[in-house]
Amino acid sequence: MNEQEQPRRRRRRLYRTSADWFGLATVALLMICSLVLLVQLMSTKLLTDLYLIVIEVILLLINAGHVIIQLPIRRVKTSKVVCGLLAVLLSGLMLYGSVAAASGKSALLAIAGHTLQKTTSYVVVMDDDPARSIGDTVGYTFGILSEDADISADNTQALLDDIKDGLGGRVDTSTCTDLTSLADALYDGNAGAIILNSSYLTTLDSLEDYSTFSKDTRIIYEFSTTKEVEPIKPNASITSQPFIVYCSGIDARSSDINIQSLSDVNILAVIHPRTHQILLINTPRDYYVPLARNGQRDKLTHAGMYGIDESAAVLGNLYGVKADYYARVNFAGLKKIVDALDGVDVNSEHEFTTVGMEVPDENGDGVHMAGYTFTQGINHLNGEQALCFARERHAFGDGDNQRGKNQMAVIRAIVDKASSPAILKGYQKVLDAVSSSFITSLTYEDISSLVQMQLRDNVHWNITSYSVSGEGGMEPCYSAGNETLWVMWPNATQIN
């Protein structure tokens, strides 16, 4: 009898089938993807310990459940196949989460701890000049600014050294003492070409006698240098002590956010993490203030020609404070950020229609004219509408002052949308938009500390704004060669 039962027992023994091996393979895949996700999330330093513990427990339970189902050999394989397919799906979601976490970290690293400052100079000729490239300027006399008048004298010299070999080893130059004299040298034919810092083009266009300079001339060569500024060390008390961020908005032709440029938006953001208060102080771009570098009076916007640290120092001197950090956005970038957020709700103090203005095309290769009408109260705006809303000044009697208020209204709307769960919908688009059009001197560690605070406390920020004003008049401006320009004298009562 024992000999007869022995074959039967052997026949009842269960062996692993392809379904079993599939299940075990999916368990291994699930474990690997879980580990990758956990490592990526921890490396971002954006999540609090509580969030990480919850995620770890969830991952542990998921993996334990799959092991319990897949490890034993079972006669019925349906549960193993279904569980294996579920493991594949979960692994895919975990890999997606890992990629999203890595993308978020890369985007923050790209904008945080900014230490580069880029200076760009152009070789400019008249629009009807036959020269189409720098090689066509052999024998030309190049007009340059004197060293004490040139905001980028080192870059000008580096440009001359760069083109010298291609022009027969010699470059003839003619030195001018101020910006308008340099432009006149080109118009009068005393110089075949001139070398200009990129910021000077906007400055010349703002002068009444040179308002068509950009249309009358053509850039045939561009030369840039970058220098590294001293990085700011992480602030261990950034989530507990007040700090000030200088917010600069530029409207540069170049899409490069690092380039030195006039600063059209100048806002000091005073942030108090403990009380969850943010005070935005807007200062008009035409404020007539002493430059920090030499004490010469100029428009506030012109301070940006010397670098963002100069603009921050000028505002610091004006209000008797010191900006701890700076943040900078290009107007073209503002459009991208708002679109990535699927629009923002902006509160307008007035009903107004914008004067037609140039805004960037979708592909970024050109511009087109746009104009919009905004109602008093809440307006849901896309990127282009928000850009026009923030730029407009000609529709208001107190132009620059109201524009500053509108800019702060847009900033408030962006902060509200970005700090809400709605941001998760377009997470990747927002990251792409921010990383290409926004920089800050806040370190990655500082930003991660603030993000953790937001997640931990679910903070709702109370944002208030304040704008200073003044009396307008015509005064000489240092960066424009002491040309007389319309400026705004600061209101001492408001500032003090």
Labelled PLM ranges:
Residues 1-16:
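Terminal targeting segments of Actinobacterial cell-envelope proteins
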Residues 95-113:
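Hydrophobic alpha-helical transmembrane segments in integral membrane proteins
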Residues 109-119, 124-128, 133-135, 140-496:
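Non-catalytic, solvent-exposed segments at the cell envelope interface
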Residues 77-100:
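Internal/C-terminal transmembrane anchor helices
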Residues 68-76:
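Structural signal for the C-terminal ends of transmembrane alpha-helices
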